[in-house]
A protein has these predicted regions:
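Transmembrane alpha-helices and immediately adjacent membrane-cytoplasm interface residues
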Residues: 43-84
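C-terminal transmembrane module of polytopic alpha-helical membrane proteins
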Residues: 89, 115-116, 137, 147, ...
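Generic helix N-cap/helix-start motif at coil->alpha-helix transitions
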Residues: 64-73, 100-108, 133-142, 167-177, ...
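Alpha-helical segment of the N-proximal tetratricopeptide repeat
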Residues: 67-118, 142-146, 214
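A detector for small-residue-rich transmembrane helices and their helix-helix packing motifs
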Residues: 269, 279-514
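N-terminal signal-anchor/start-transfer transmembrane helix
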Residues: 4-25
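Alpha-helical repeat scaffolds
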Residues: 86-94, 121-131, 152-166, 187-202, ...
Length: 514
């Protein structure tokens, strides 16, 4: 398999998914514009230089999609940890690579966050004001932050309700601000009603992190301490420690545990984040009203559904999981593959004779009678560095998620059984295909951990399938759809790439699901 072919598939699949996501969300974004431009350039390159399509499109894709996406994730990580100087430098690079969706104003926005952190609200407002009125994707966030700076929740409600009268709220940031404003102004019944309508029934928020952030605010204002803790320790663990403490204290205060809440708010009031300190002081001076002991049937129904959904997704929504649980078994397997590859290098990692001597499987197996160890050894050998890197990446991405869901030993068993099992089945299946005249009679050499990687995908697919059958969750459905799309793309790729064994991949996938 040529690197150019691999690049073409990676770029095409990623840009296609960006376009589909924008269409599904009914929001045309700058990411979709860039993806469409790259897809059009790919079509043009196919007509002009078909042998270089991957290389031609990989350059703009790397510059204007991959690097901005990585930078966006890094920026969020830095801001969450209050590293604003480094975040400002990263935002400047991001602004040049992705000036759409308000990206050009991102450095000013990060500066405003830094001034807010230090308590300089005047400078923060000076920077936010022009962003808030430029009608970009960043303007809504800037405007919500402006209202939040001084706790102008009634004004925020009025503005968002005015926006909602003109067109339904679809921006997750506006929905978050709207629901928080309802909670801050003590309108808990309306908060639960609107959450049920906008988030549960109409499903207008499709981002997993933003959905859980909204859920956390709702349950905190409703005094549901246990659910708040579960969210903050799980899918929202990336939030800064002081932010998590603030919202847990909010839940405690709403639940009537005033003494515990007061101690934590007093700690935050003297903390380094001056904006959060001011909000904590307001909680001390103007505490939330305690939630009524008796709830209405509607409120109980929403909160029970919330608790059930969060528990269900914590167990089954493994693709978007942000838990910090370590994955040592995944890394052990990656290091093992790397160590075995080092043994290939002296004799040549693409030299078939060298691979044969190291334990590659030869088909028909009658050429190596009784050498059953080849079924195992072949699963750890790779034909060149590109083959190795692809499987290492797949193992890291899918294996880590399955290990967090199942644990290290079950994940290892799934990997080994599918990697070896897919190779054991291959000679028998190939023999049947040859007897039907659907495959040639050439001698084949088989190496690679691809069956194991597809087995991990199969394991994740089966895990999500159990989640679909055992409960209702839009997030689990969405993750199942993403995996189904990955499997479809992988199948199309296998069928169009002669050097790749579609049989082994299919074996691994099916064994993993089972």
């Amino acid at each position: 398999m040529e690197f150019n072919t691999l690049l073409m598939w990676i770029v095409g699949a990623n840009c296609g998914m960006l376009l589909l996501r924008s269409v599904a969300a009914r929001r045309w974004t700058g990411w979709a514009t860039v993806a469409l431009a790259i897809m059009l350039s790919m079509a043009a390159a196919w007509l002009i230089v078909p042998q270089r399509v991957g290389w031609v499109t990989a350059i703009p894709w790397t510059l204007f999609v991959l690097l901005p996406m990585l930078g966006n994730g890094l920026l969020g990580w830095l801001v969450a940890r209050h590293r604003y100087r480094t975040a400002y430098l990263a935002s400047q690079l991001f602004a040049w690579l992705h000036p759409f969706d308000g990206g050009w104003n991102l450095p000013r926005f990060v500066q405003a966050l830094e001034y807010t952190f230090h308590g300089d609200l005047e400078q923060s407002r000076r920077l936010l004001s022009p962003i808030a009125h430029d009608r970009s994707a960043l303007s809504n966030l800037a405007r919500v932050l402006e209202y939040r700076l001084e706790g102008r929740w009634d004004e925020l409600l009025s503005w968002i309700q005015h926006e909602a009268r003109e067109q339904p709220l679809r921006d997750p940031l506006l929905i978050d601000g709207y629901l928080q404003a309802l909670g801050e102004t003590g309108r808990r019944h309306e908060l639960l009603h609107e959450y049920q309508r906008i988030v549960l029934q109409e499903q207008r928020v499709d981002d997993a992190f933003q959905t859980n952030l909204i859920r956390m605010r709702v349950v905190a204002f409703c005094g549901e301490v246990a659910i708040t803790e579960k969210l903050l320790a799980g899918p929202l663990s990336r939030l800064a420690a002081d932010t998590r403490q603030f919202w847990l204290s909010t839940a405690l205060q709403a639940a009537g545990q005033a003494d515990q809440a007061r101690v934590q708010f007093e700690q935050l009031a003297s903390g380094p984040d001056r904006q959060l300190a001011r909000r904590a002081q307001l909680r001390l001076e103007q505490p939330l009203t305690v939630v009524a002991t008796e709830r209405t049937p509607e409120e109980l129904a929403v909160l029970n559904e919330l608790a059930r959904t969060i528990g269900h997704e914590t167990h089954y929504a493994v693709m978007s999981s942000t838990t910090r649980r370590q994955t040592p078994m995944t890394w052990l397997l990656i290091l093992t593959l790397l160590a075995v590859f080092c043994l290939e290098i002296p004799g040549g990692a693409t030299d078939e004779l060298n691979l044969f001597e190291l334990g590659a499987l030869i088909v028909p197996t009658s050429l190596t009678p009784g050498e059953y160890d080849r079924y195992v050894l072949a699963a750890f050998l790779h034909f060149g560095w590109l083959h190795l890197l692809m499987n290492m990446f797949g193992l890291l991405w899918f294996g880590g998620r399955l290990e967090r869901a199942w644990g290290g030993l079950p994940m290892l068993c799934c990997y080994l059984l599918t990697a070896i099992g897919s190779i054991v089945l291959f000679p028998m299946e190939l023999s049947v295909l040859r007897s039907w005249g659907w495959a040639g009679n050439d001698i084949s050499i088989l190496v690679g951990a691809s069956g194991g990687v597809l087995g991990l995908i199969g394991g994740l697919t089966g895990h999500l399938l159990v989640g679909l059958l055992s409960g209702r969750s839009a997030l689990v459905w969405r993750e199942f759809g993403i995996l189904a799309l990955i499997v479809t793309l992988q199948t199309v790729f296998d069928l169009n790439t002669p050097a790749v064994s579609a049989l082994v991949h299919t074996n691994g996938l099916i064994l993993g699901i089972v």
